[in-house]
UniProtKB/Swiss-Prot annotation:
Binding site for Mg(2+): D316
UniProt remark on cofactor binding: Binds 1 Mg(2+) or Mn(2+) ion per subunit.
Alphabetical list of SMART domains matching this protein: Iso_dh (SM01329)
Record family assignment: Belongs to the isocitrate and isopropylmalate dehydrogenases family.
Binding site for NADP(+): T114, H348, G349, T350, A351, P352, K353, Y354, N361, Y400, R404
The keyword Magnesium appears for this protein: yes
Protein name, as recorded: Isocitrate dehydrogenase [NADP]
Residues the record marks as site: Critical for catalysis: Y169, K239
Subunit description: Homodimer.
EC number of the protein: 1.1.1.42
Function: Catalyzes the oxidative decarboxylation of isocitrate to 2-oxoglutarate and carbon dioxide with the concomitant reduction of NADP(+).
GO molecular function: isocitrate dehydrogenase (NADP+) activity; magnesium ion binding; NAD binding
Species whose genome carries this gene: Helicobacter pylori (strain ATCC 700392 / 26695)
Catalytic class of the enzyme: oxidoreductase
Amino acid sequence: MAYNPKILQKPKEGEEITIKDNKLHVPNHPIIPFIEGDGIGSDITPAMIKVVDSAVQKAYKGEKKIAWYEVFVGEKCYQKFKDYKELSPEEQWLLPDTIEAINHYKVSIKGPLTTPIGEGFRSLNVALRQKMDLYVCLRPVRWYGSPSPVKEPQKVDMVIFRENSEDIYAGIEWQEGSAEAKKLIHFLQNELKVKKIRFPESSGIGVKPISKEGTERLVRKAIEYAIDNDKPSVTFVHKGNIMKYTEGAFMKWGYALAQKEFNAQVIDKGPWCSLKNPKNGKEIIIKDMIADAFLQQILLRPSEYSVIATMNLNGDYISDALAAMVGGIGIAPGANLNDTVGMFEATHGTAPKYAGLDKVNPGSIILSAEMMLRHMGWVEAADLIVSAMEKAIKSKKVTYDFARLMDGAKEVKCSEFASVMIENM
């Protein structure tokens, strides 16, 4: 299918990334859509582009170059397109051309987004994921030398596969007192004989869908990642001890998939199991842990965990808790993926009070771009960014959030930190 935008201009240069035989085929001048983002997006996204262009130039000496293509979602989108009568109020914030571009060009990157205030609008980040069925939220967490509240942050090296399309984040909920809430509570009490709603007259109510298909496709991706990246274990994190038919089912379906598709063998009497990595013969342990115990274990024994597969709400808590251990969400990268599309993103918010001050840490979106380059197979450029980040932090020329926690640090602006990274390539 050709990309035929109704409002945006087509890209003026570059070539399309394609998929053949389930593999990404990346030309030397790929078109990469980017969403600048709201608030501090105007600070961090140009810094990221500068770092990425420098890494690509240094790694490939001009042979490869990204053709950046700006697309629009959020406040900037609304300000640009609010007078377009052919767009609905929702489309003025979430441009249909943008969805089409992200789907068509396969790989994209975005800054943080403002969610519009008012009825009918939920998170734009969630809307993007749901519209394109980007069912994996991928959050790698490792230490780059930044200030940390824990004694041994270097022991943290995990990759979280968070299910993106289900759980209570599906947004199936109704306000207390609404006709829908009353109707559903009445149905539960009278048809299904539910007696556990403590205050039925004053309850808002929500639904938590967890499916076998949703679980299997997430767990499959997590195990494939462990195989491809030589990881020692995959841990299912859940609250199946309390929610047996949703989170408990997630765990059971996960183990069943590992056994059925990857020939995992039960250890002792289970449920843990083990499979051989077909690429190198090493053992990969498939295990599970209750979510609250896991949040303790990542502090006490982080080196025992590698790839994590979990549902939406747990994944949100876990990825931010882990990020805090290695320097905070200011440098936590992330991506949203399905079987063909990868959308990489800054994982923090818009921080409007810092917008335009050239002050904040651009690390999150820069490291998300590093993930993007690796996803594209441009490993040499990605490696340059990782080493430049480590060297920049070691040099103590850092943005204010790190400078205030480091002895002898020199505080630099957002754009200057990008320059420090480039000097360290």
